[in-house]
Amino acid sequence: MAQFNSTWAISGRRSAISVDTFHALSIQAPGLLLGTLLFYLFYKYTTRIYFHPLSGIPGPRLAAATHLYEAYYNILRQGLSKRAVQLHKAYNSPVIRLGTNRVHVGDPSYYHTIYNSGTDYHKDPGVYKLLGIDGSILTITDPEEHKQYRSIVGSLFSRKTADDLAPMMAALLNRSTESMARQGREGKPSVIQRIYRSVAADMVSYLLFNRPLGLIDSPQEADHYHSFMLSIDRFTAITWPRFYYPILNWVIDSFPAFVVERLQPGLRNLQELFKGWLDESIAAHDAGKPVESRSTYFDLMIEAKRKTGEPLRPDQLFDDILNYLVAGMEATSYVLSFGTYFLLNSPEAKAKLEAELLEASPFIREKFDHRRIMALPYLTAVVKECLRLSNTVPGFLPRVVPKGGVDIGGYHIPGGTQISMIHPVVELNEEIFPNPHEFIPERWLGDNGQDLEKWAIAFSKGRRQCIGKNLAYMMLYASIAVVFSRLEMELYETTAADMEIIDQFAPIIQGVVKVKITKDRWRE
């Protein structure tokens, strides 16, 4: 019995010790976990700042340590691109470090190395996949896959297609300027930016499907703000939050249909419209009907998928179409809005343009000939200056440094590093463009203009340049020619503050461009 009691006592003490130990550990566990986490973060950030291959490149230490630096500027401060320009000046360096594995180049001479044809600097897959537009031309990063994709849709974006669509462009411009002139007679201002968006969206729809969306003639166009545009504005407003926090894409995709319809009115209707057009194309192909006029986007995709045996994914096609619509509508209307603002603030340039357009009236008003319009020298200079100053690509277009790395400004940048160069580095460079912030179309005329051609980078350069370049040029020339030959106008409640550029991956402006029509020259 004594032995039993002794054993029990020892066992009890052990049990008490175990309980005490567990209790002590349970109290200390949060502290241990916190300490471990802090040590991990300290090690991680110290390594990134001081021992990373990019540690010798100037730049904010916070940017080197965490992506929160760029997230802050992109989400809350209208874009990291503006900050990049300031950082190059602050550090007096042609290269700055903007992220844990990311650098930005501020020397224009390297632009054609990074973005030229045949370059080994390819799109960074880690960036473009976060845009959430699966299978669109924007997010394809593999050069061979991109080449194959362009071979499928290339005919849609040819110069011949742009030529064929010119009469439709003229008709849309006639109807839209008539609407603006009517508003002028009623004493109402026109939100010309929205009108440009409607025209551009209808033209992109013509290009893709041989028929317009009908935005110009829509009943919703009383104030030229279609529900589709409202949806796009809301969608682009959360581009950066979705980019840095991809779980938001999952959350948005999980919303019930009625919530999506409330948040993005117009997009659901657009999906249904495109689904109907897709079903028509599939039925026509199944019945062996010949393609009328020219092949549409759906025709080309159906044929390509059936050749390879791949399934046709309507959701992927819709994402691709939406990318084309938004890019074509936003970029074109954005440049035209800037152009209108610049011209109405530059009486001398406006007078020169209007004089040239008056002489060209026979092939603008009477028998529209866009090829002759695009040959007008001063109009060409105006278009190029609008493209330069509007900064159509405010963001970074990230690429990956090839194996072996590259030396820039005395710094070695190893292969695998994300590298980029914002367009303002070139377009607002004082050595290339003296008085870079001033609207001076004359800089593009004569021999000087020829020398500047290599720096006309609004549509980027190389194999990944804008696929819609031909259509965009046609729309820009035609719009400025028709609007400024027909309408006398002045800015209405639009200031420089409204033209402040915000980088939402695609550029937008702070406000809207409004004009007041004072005369319709074609009704005199």
From Swiss-Prot:
GO cellular component, one term: membrane
InterPro entries: Cyt_P450, Cyt_P450_CS, Cyt_P450_E_grp-I, Cyt_P450_sf, Cytochrome_P450_monoxygenase
Cofactor(s) needed by this chain: heme
Residues that hold heme according to the record: 466
Catalytic activity: cyclo(L-arginyl-tyrosyl) + reduced [NADPH--hemoprotein reductase] + O2 = cyclo(L-arginyl-L-dehydrotyrosyl) + oxidized [NADPH--hemoprotein reductase] + 2 H2O + H(+)
Membrane topology: Single-pass membrane protein
Main location: membrane
GO MF, one example: oxidoreductase activity, acting on paired donors, with incorporation or reduction of molecular oxygen
Gene3D superfamilies: Cytochrome P450
Protein's cellular compartments: Membrane
GO biological process: small molecule biosynthetic process
EC number: 1.-.-.-
Biological or metabolic pathway of the protein: Alkaloid biosynthesis
Main EC class the enzyme belongs to: oxidoreductase
Keywords of this entry: Heme, Iron, Membrane, Metal-binding, Monooxygenase, Oxidoreductase, Transmembrane, Transmembrane helix
Transmembrane segments: 22-42
UniProt family annotation: Belongs to the cytochrome P450 family.
Function: Cytochrome P450 monooxygenase; part of the ank cluster that mediates the biosynthesis of NK13650 C, a highly modified cyclo-arginine-tyrosine dipeptide. AnkB is responsible for desaturation of the ankA product cyclo-Arg-Tyr diketopiperazine, likely through hydroxylation of the benzylic position followed by dehydration to yield a dehydro-cyclodipeptide. Within the pathway, the cyclodipeptide synthase ankA acts as the scaffold-generating enzyme and is responsible for formation of the cyclo-Arg-Tyr diketopiperazine (cRY) from L-Arg and L-Tyr.
Protein name: Cytochrome P450 monooxygenase ankB
Gene: ankB
